[in-house]
């Protein structure tokens, strides 16, 4: 078996122990100490409209050193094609994250931009990207940081049957076929395999609410998502 096949087969059916989760956990504990791989966020959207905009976009190859068939385009960022972390780019690597020239790009995605500005509970955006994985495409096992934190938003816009995001020792993230939002701890080793005949479209959001102050709306969404996991173990 290949590295990817071994990782998927060994971890896709794992479950994580939630038997000791406190029912009264607050936002700070959930995102920094719970050790959960993900928490669902229940945020409505016109998912077919977002999916249509994602499908029509022009994509740029992304991290081809550890993937195949993975591409991306920025909705908000330095430009449409600057899909990686700003420190990868020589001209920006010495800047602080606050000084990177992030802005809405000229991608033709009017509804997605409207939804992000009017409905998603962030006030400041860094990179916001459509991500595509072609049929048979994959992202090899990797981590995005060493410190635990639920800090990346991963949205399944179109997640065809047979496409999995698998987390080491914690199983498969339960994306709906279309339209589901998760706060994701990307410090855990994880991998993607699109074992389907359709393109897989996701959106990944990096940003924060209220200029580093966590809004009550966002706190409530995270706590509600966390509590939705509790019935699984009671």
Residues covered by each model-derived region:
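Ordered hydrophobic segments in well-structured contexts
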Residues: 40, 74, 129-132, 181-183, ...
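Catalytic core of non-heme Fe(II) oxygenases with the double-stranded beta-helix
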Residues: 112-183
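Non-heme Fe(II)/2-oxoglutarate
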Residues: 1-119
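A subset of signal/propeptide-processing and intrinsically disordered low-complexity segments
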Residues: 59, 79, 137-139, 185
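Catalytic core of Fe(II)/2-oxoglutarate
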Residues: 159-234
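Histidine (H) residue identity feature
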Residues: 11, 62, 76, 82-85, ...
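A short, structural micro-pattern
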Residues: 67, 124, 149, 197-199
């Amino acid at each position: 078996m290949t590295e990817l096949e071994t990782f998927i087969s060994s971890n896709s059916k794992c479950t994580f122990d939630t038997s000791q989760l406190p029912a009264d956990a607050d936002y700070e504990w959930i995102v920094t100490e719970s050790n959960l791989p993900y928490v669902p966020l229940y945020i409505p959207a016109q998912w077919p409209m977002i999916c249509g905009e994602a499908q029509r976009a022009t994509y740029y190859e992304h991290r081809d050193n550890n993937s195949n068939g993975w591409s991306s385009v920025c909705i908000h960022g330095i430009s449409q094609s600057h899909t990686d972390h700003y420190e990868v780019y020589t001209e920006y690597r010495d800047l602080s994250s606050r000084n990177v020239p992030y802005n809405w790009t000229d991608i033709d995605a009017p509804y997605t931009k409207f939804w992000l500005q009017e409905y998603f509970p962030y006030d400041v955006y860094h990179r916001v990207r459509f991500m595509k994985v072609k049929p048979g495409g994959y992202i090899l096992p990797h981590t995005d940081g060493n410190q635990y934190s639920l800090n990346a938003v991963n949205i399944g816009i179109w997640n065809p049957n047979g496409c999995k995001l698998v987390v080491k020792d914690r199983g498969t993230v339960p994306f709906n076929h279309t339209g589901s939002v998760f706060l994701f701890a990307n410090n855990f080793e994880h991998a993607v395999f699109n074992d389907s005949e359709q393109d897989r479209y996701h959106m990944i959001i990096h940003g924060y609410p209220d200029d580093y102050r966590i809004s009550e709306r966002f706190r409530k969404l995270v706590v509600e998502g966390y509590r939705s996991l509790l019935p699984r173990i009671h």
